[in-house]
C-alpha cells in the first residue's frame, strides 16, 4: 500500500475523529506492525505514530517485517522478543515519549486577485485532479485561480465523481497482466486510461485530512496499483495545490516527493495557503503554472534523489526475484533496461579487476593512493575545459 496504509484503515481513522471517539483510545498502549518489502514503510509508521499521538495513546514502537519473515526462524524469534518487550511495557506501565505535536490549523480566507498576463497552454492538456467537497473554500478558490492562469484553462476532474466500487484488496492478481478484479465493474480504470494518464500535465489538489489526504484519495492511489510497478505519468509535469498546514507535516511532504520521483514525473511545486497572504498565494500559483509550461516545453525532469534510487532498487529486486507473479512489470522493466544490477556493468568490472590486481603490489598501492584525488576529478575537468 504505496507509502502509507490501506485506504480502508485510513477511513477507520477518519471515522474515529468524525464520531468523536478519541476517548476510547486515550492512554492505551500501542505499536504499529507492518509486513512489506520495506518500501517506504517508515512513512507509514510515521503516519501511524502521529495519529496515535493525536489520540493521546502510549505509542511504544514500530516493527517493520518483510513479507516472508514469518518463514524464517531467526525472524520469528525476533518478533517474539518484540512482543515480549511490548507486553512487559504494558504490564509495567512504562512511560512513552510523544514525538509529534498536534497539528494546528489556522482560520484564513483566501481571496484571489486578477490574473493580468496568462500562461500559454501551448496546446497542452492540463488536468487538475481533486477530491474537493466545498467549492467555496480556500482549496476551491486556489484551483480556480490556477485554472484562470492559463490562456485555454484546464480540465478539472473530481475523484468523488468517479464510480469506484471499493479499495484495493492486495490480491496482486493484476501482477500477471495488469487486469484488476474490478475491471468492468466500475469506472475507475476507464477514467485512468482515458482521462488521467492521457493528460500532458497533472496538478493534484487533494484535501488534507489529519496527517495525510482523505481516505477517498488514498483509495484512488491504491487502485492505481492495477498497473503494478509501471508508471502511468512518466516524463510529465506535476504540481500540488494544498490548503492546510503542510509545514507541520514533513512526513506528508516526503510522501509527495517520493510519489513524484517513483512515478518518473517532474514535481514543479507544492503551493499552499500557509503564507496567509493573498498576493503571495496568487504569485506562487501563477509561477507554478509558468514553470509547468516552461519545463514541459523542454521535457525537463530533474535528476532523482535517494527517494527514487533507493525505491527503484527495492522494486528492481522485487520484480526480478518474483517475475513469475509480476509478469507485466518484468516485461516493462526488461524492455526499458531497468534491471541495472551493478554486476552487469562490464566496464566497471574490468576496471575494478585491473586496479585490484595492480594494488596487490604495496608500492603501487601507495602510488595510487597519492593519485586518487587528482585522478577522480580529471575526467570532469576535461569535460569542463571543453565546454
Regions found by a protein language model. Give the residues of each.
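Extended, hydrophobic interaction surfaces within ordered domains
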Residues: 9-18, 22-106, 140, 144, ...
Amino acid at each position: 500500500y504505496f507509502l502509507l496504509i490501506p485506504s480502508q484503515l485510513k477511513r477507520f481513522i477518519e471515522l474515529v475523529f468524525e464520531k468523536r471517539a478519541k476517548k476510547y483510545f486515550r492512554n492505551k498502549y500501542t505499536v504499529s506492525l507492518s509486513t512489506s518489502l520495506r518500501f517506504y514503510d517508515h512513512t507509514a509508521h510515521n503516519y501511524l505514530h502521529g495519529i496515535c499521538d493525536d489520540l493521546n495513546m502510549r505509542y511504544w514502537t514500530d516493527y517493520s517485517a518483510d513479507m516472508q519473515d514469518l518463514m524464517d526462524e531467526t525472524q520469528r524469534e525476533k518478533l517474539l522478543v518484540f512482543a515480549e518487550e511490548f507486553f512487559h511495557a504494558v504490564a509495567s506501565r512504562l512511560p512513552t515519549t510523544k514525538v509529534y505535536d498536534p497539528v494546528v490549523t489556522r482560520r484564513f480566507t483566501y481571496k484571489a486577485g486578477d490574473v493580468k498576463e496568462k500562461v500559454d497552454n501551448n496546446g497542452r492538456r492540463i488536468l487538475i485532479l481533486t477530491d474537493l467537497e466545498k467549492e467555496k473554500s480556500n482549496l476551491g478558490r486556489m484551483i480556480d485561480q490556477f485554472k484562470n492562469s492559463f490562456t485555454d484553462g484546464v480540465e478539472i476532474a473530481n475523484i468523488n465523481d468517479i464510480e469506484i466500487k471499493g479499495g484495493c484488496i492486495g490480491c496482486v492478481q493484476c501482477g500477471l497482466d495488469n487486469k484488476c478484479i474490478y475491471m468492468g465493474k466500475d469506472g475507475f480504470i476507464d477514467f485512468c486510461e482515458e482521462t488521467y494518464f492521457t493528460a500532458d500535465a497533472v496538478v493534484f489538489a487533494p484535501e488534507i485530512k489529519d496527517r495525510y489526504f482523505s481516505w477517498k484519495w488514498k483509495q484512488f492511489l491504491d487502485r492505481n496499483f492495477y498497473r503494478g510497478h509501471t508508471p502511468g505519468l512518466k516524463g510529465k509535469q506535476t504540481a500540488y495545490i494544498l490548503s492546510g498546514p503542510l509545514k507541520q507535516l514533513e512526513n506528508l511532504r516526503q510522501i509527495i516527493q517520493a510519489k513524484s520521483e517513483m512515478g518518473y514525473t517532474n514535481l514543479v511545486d507544492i503551493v499552499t495557503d500557509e503564507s496567509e497572504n493573498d498576493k503571495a498565494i496568487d504569485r506562487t500559483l501563477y509561477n507554478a503554472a509558468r514553470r509547468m509550461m516552461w519545463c514541459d516545453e523542454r521535457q525537463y525532469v530533474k535528476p532523482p534523489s535517494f527517494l527514487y534510487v533507493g525505491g527503484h532498487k527495492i522494486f528492481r529486486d522485487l520484480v526480478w526475484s518474483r517475475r513469475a507473479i509480476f509478469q507485466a512489470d518484468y516485461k516493462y522493466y526488461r524492455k526499458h533496461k531497468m534491471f541495472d544490477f551493478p554486476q552487469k556493468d562490464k566496464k566497471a568490472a574490468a576496471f575494478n579487476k585491473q586496479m585490484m590486481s595492480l594494488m596487490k603490489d604495496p608500492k603501487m598501492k601507495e602510488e595510487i593512493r597519492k593519485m586518487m584525488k587528482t585522478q577522480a576529478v580529471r575526467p570532469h575537468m576535461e569535460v569542463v575545459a571543453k565546454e
